[in-house]
């Protein structure tokens, strides 16, 4: 009887998990990078990344980055770099109200559009080893410049009044008397953020495998450290040889910032690094 109850509970848990997954998006993030070390302290790297979203059917962004790092001490490392980002902004809907601020008068519906971004980062990473575990904390400052962009915008205005017999336009279950397709100019802007990451890595004795888990949170420095996004990752680094490294992982990301979709996402990441 107890076994049946356990089986039933396990089945219900799986169903709940499946329901949760259905409410979130799924993506695949792939990356390729190269790294060159100059002695034991200084190294440079370059890499490209591609992210697919909407159940891994549509591109969300791709980027190219250059970076460098310097080990000040065995436990302390400094880093800096530049990343060019080509990102897709998803549809955004903003309700419009009358002067009273309460009565709905319509919607502005911005279509999807692509935007270029330029990012500089500076970081400090501290780490400590305990047995076969390595604990690390990275604090990264991000400066991102958003280029100007243009998108299509649907403007729905004026709710249908009693006795109206003209054309109507339906959006979000509401009928409107006016509709206009226009373009909207997105102004260039700058953003400053702090991204903190805590990671625990384990070195498996006798195997070239290092499983790890990490938690990362990003806060907006220009808005009183407002929460932007968080990311949980569980992965496995496989050192195939001294020069070839593979990285596999699962990511769950939640965000309040709508720059790239304002949604929760489950993602599988696959990365390859070549070390000169």
Give the location of each predicted region.
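Residues that define the transmembrane beta-barrel architecture of outer-membrane proteins
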Residues: 26-28, 60-62, 116-120, 188-194, ...
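Flexible, solvent-exposed coil segments and beta strand-coil junctions
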Residues: 41-49, 85, 92-106, 171-180, ...
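Residues on the lipid-exposed face of transmembrane beta-strands in outer-membrane beta-barrel proteins
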Residues: 32-36, 66-70, 122-126, 141, ...
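Outer-membrane beta-barrel transmembrane domain signature
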Residues: 139-247, 251-255
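Outer-membrane beta-barrel translocator/channel fold
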Residues: 53-55, 59-61, 71, 75-153, ...
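Bacterial N-terminal signal peptides that target proteins for export
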Residues: 1-8
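Sec/Tat signal peptide C-region and signal peptidase I cleavage site
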Residues: 18-22
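Repeated loop/turn-to-beta-strand initiation elements of outer-membrane beta-barrel proteins
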Residues: 41-46, 75-80, 131-135, 206-210, ...
């Amino acid at each position: 009887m107890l076994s049946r109850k356990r089986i039933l509970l396990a089945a219900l848990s799986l169903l709940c998990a499946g329901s949760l997954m259905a409410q979130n998006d799924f993506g695949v993030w792939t990356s390729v990078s190269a790294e060159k070390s100059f002695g034991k302290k200084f190294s440079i790297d370059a890499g490209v990344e591609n992210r697919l979203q909407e159940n891994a059917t549509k591109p969300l962004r791709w980027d190219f980055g250059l970076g460098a790092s310097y080990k000040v001490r065995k436990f302390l490392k400094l880093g800096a770099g530049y990343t060019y980002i080509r990102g897709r902004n998803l549809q955004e809907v903003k309700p419009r109200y009358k002067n009273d601020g309460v009565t709905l008068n319509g919607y502005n519906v911005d279509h999807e559009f692509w935007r270029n971004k330029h990012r500089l980062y500076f970081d400090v990473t501290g780490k400590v080893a305990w047995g076969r575990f390595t604990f690390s904390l990275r604090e990264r400052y991000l400066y991102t410049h958003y280029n100007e962009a243009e998108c299509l915008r649907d403007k729905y205005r004026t709710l249908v009044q009693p006795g109206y017999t003209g054309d109507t336009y339906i959006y979000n279950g509401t009928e409107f008397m006016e509709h206009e397709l226009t373009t909207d100019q997105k102004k260039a802007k700058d953003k400053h953020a702090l991204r903190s990451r805590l990671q625990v890595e384990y070195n498996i004795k006798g195997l070239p495998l290092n499983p790890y888990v990490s938690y990362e949170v990003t806060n907006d420095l220009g808005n009183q450290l407002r929460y932007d996004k968080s990311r949980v990752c569980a992965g496995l680094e496989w050192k195939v040889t001294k020069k070839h490294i593979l990285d596999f992982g699962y990511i769950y990301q939640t965000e309040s910032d709508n720059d790239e979709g304002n949604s929760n996402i489950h993602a599988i990441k696959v990365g390859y690094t070549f070390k000169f």
